[in-house]
Amino acid sequence: MTNPVIIALDFPNWQKTDQFLQQFPKDEALFVKIGMELFYQEGPQLIKTLKARDYRIFLDLKLYDIPNTVQSAMTVIGQLGVDYTTIHAAGGQTMLQAGAAGLKAGAKQANVKPAKLLAITQLTSTNEAQMQQEQLVSVSLPESVAHYAQLAQQSDCDGVICSAQEITTIKSKTATDFLCVTPGIRPATSQNNDQKRAVTPLEAAQMHSNGIVVGRPITQASDPYQAYQAIKSEWESFK
């Protein structure tokens, strides 16, 4: 699963999460994303439970604090043995490097493979007008994203979370193997909801995304497994 379809488990508790997962074959090698709500409700035991099912895990907590605090928190995350985790690029180079160091230290302590550290650039719910007016950023949205991506690469991160439209620019300014993981994925028949820079699975593949994160089009589907298979098929159709 080099370029995965990652299911965002945006549920309030383990009971609802497990009810959803029971709709998938037990041998389906899922890659799932755990966000703040579910992790804060269930804690690290949730990660252990999912790993026992041989799921790959993206722990999306978007750390953003002073460098020492981020390093300590990332050490704990590193011990969990997750596959991906996130940090805010806006925290700056010292914070990003501290997070990367903590993640590797925690993995070493637990004798597990270090997670890929992905930096948040601009949220896919943010448009250019909002960014310029509310963040007082004078450059364009693509320029801001590219700047954060370069900063992340220079600060020991493995990649970024970004909209698919930004991938070409990011890879041209970083490296072809710098990971670009794409949220805001919506099949053509789906509503965009609060994702303002959404694309289809095929479009993301054509733009060379290294992985897509899909939530409601799967979790709120009448048949989640069928919806997952359809999205996965579309995603993998572009070679």
Swiss-Prot record:
Subunit structure: Homodimer.
Function statement: Catalyzes the decarboxylation of orotidine 5'-monophosphate (OMP) to uridine 5'-monophosphate (UMP).
Top EC class of this enzyme: lyase
Active site: 62
E.C. code: 4.1.1.23
InterPro entries per record: Aldolase_TIM (IPR013785), OMPdecase (IPR014732), OMPdecase_AS (IPR018089), OMPdecase_bac (IPR047596), OMPdeCOase_dom (IPR001754), RibuloseP-bd_barrel (IPR011060)
Organism: Latilactobacillus sakei subsp. sakei (strain 23K) (Lactobacillus sakei subsp. sakei)
GO cellular component, one term: cytosol
Reaction catalyzed: orotidine 5'-phosphate + H(+) = UMP + CO2
Source taxon at top rank: Bacteria
Pfam families: OMPdecase
Keyword annotations from UniProtKB, A to Z: Decarboxylase, Lyase, Pyrimidine biosynthesis
Pathway: Pyrimidine metabolism; UMP biosynthesis via de novo pathway; UMP from orotate: step 2/2
Record's protein name: Orotidine 5'-phosphate decarboxylase
SMART domains noted in UniProt: OMPdecase
Gene: pyrF
Family classification: Belongs to the OMP decarboxylase family. Type 1 subfamily.
